[in-house]
Swiss-Prot record:
The gene is ubiE. GO terms for biological process: aerobic respiration; menaquinone biosynthetic process; methylation. S-adenosyl-L-methionine binds at T92, D113, N141, A142. It catalyses: a 2-demethylmenaquinol + S-adenosyl-L-methionine = a menaquinol + S-adenosyl-L-homocysteine + H(+); a 2-methoxy-6-(all-trans-polyprenyl)benzene-1,4-diol + S-adenosyl-L-methionine = a 5-methoxy-2-methyl-3-(all-trans-polyprenyl)benzene-1,4-diol + S-adenosyl-L-homocysteine + H(+). This is Ubiquinone/menaquinone biosynthesis C-methyltransferase UbiE. The lineage of its organism: Bacteria, Pseudomonadati, Pseudomonadota, Alphaproteobacteria, Hyphomicrobiales.
């Protein structure tokens, strides 16, 4: 794999899970039974669905929009008719809309999310943007995709895979539904690698985000979970190893904003 481009005394310091996984037993910093996690995560996203963009603005200081643009630019969606993409955990449509627009409205994107509230927001936005004809909305689980093998030219997931209980299953399903030659791209909050920025970002995340979330939405707990889930997610190198283990080749990643987020790529060859 290639890269392009000490938690001591830090606020909220926690050990991240490694390449062997373990996210199924953590709901943020809280240890839970793996059968509980999906329901707990669903509750969070039912609560934040209407204000999901605000949530991402808080988590990234507004940078998520730039990162998403870069993600779609690296994907380079085809402008040929019939090119298809699956956007998982994509309920509100941010990535799918960009793909359709960059493709000159040639691409067909299936937006899949386990949360109906998020899909409802995405469908409303798609209608307002006039993009509904290029989109399909599917409520389903990333660990058990309702599609045949070799169905899609691309698979994208942005800020969603850390909320999947069994990440290894989601990666295996991504590999299965991609066509030979298909591309996997995952954008996710990650391990900050700049010594000063990591401390600043921790202070912002643990001190400010839950308080601001409560002021705006009346809900601090959901924002605390989202911050904590970022700190449990595997480091860049460990997640890249998980992607390789699922069968992908030419695995690489790019750090954004000092590692606050990372964009991972792999190919089904």
């Amino acid at each position: 794999m290639s890269q392009q481009n000490g938690n001591v005394n830090r606020v909220g310091a926690q050990d991240r899970v490694g390449a062997s996984g373990g996210m199924e037993h953590s709901f943020g910093f809280k240890a839970v039974d793996e059968n509980e996690k999906q329901g707990l995560v669903n509750d969070v996203f039912h609560k934040v669905a209407k204000r999901y963009d605000i949530m991402n603005d808080l988590m990234s200081a507004g940078m998520h929009r730039v990162w998403k643009d870069a993600m779609v630019a690296w994907l380079t969606p085809s402008k040929r008719p019939g090119w298809t993409s699956l956007d998982v955990a994509g309920g509100t449509g941010d990535i799918a809309f960009r793909i359709v627009e960059v493709s000159g409205r040639q691409a067909h994107v299936t937006i899949l999310d386990i949360n109906g509230s998020m899909l409802g927001v995405g469908r409303e936005r798609a209608i307002k943007k006039g993009l509904i004809d290029n989109l399909e909305f599917v409520e389903a689980n990333a660990e058990e995709l309702p599609f045949e093998d070799n169905s899609f030219d691309a698979y994208t997931i942005a800020f969603g895979i850390r909320n999947v209980p069994h990440i290894d299953k989601a990666l295996s399903e991504a590999y299965r539904v991609l066509k030979p030659g298909g591309r996997f791209l995952c954008l996710e909050f990650s391990e900050v690698e700049l010594p000063v920025l990591d401390k600043v970002y921790d202070e912002w995340s643990f001190r400010a985000i839950p308080r601001i979330g409560k002021m705006i939405t009346g809900d601090a707990d959901s924002y605390s979970y989202l911050v904590e889930s970022i700190r449990k997610f595997p480091k860049q190198q460990d997640f890249a190893a998980m992607i390789e283990k699922a069968g992908f080749e030419r695995v690489s990643y790019r750090n954004f904003t000092g590692g606050i987020a990372a964009l991972h790529s792999g190919w089904k060859l």
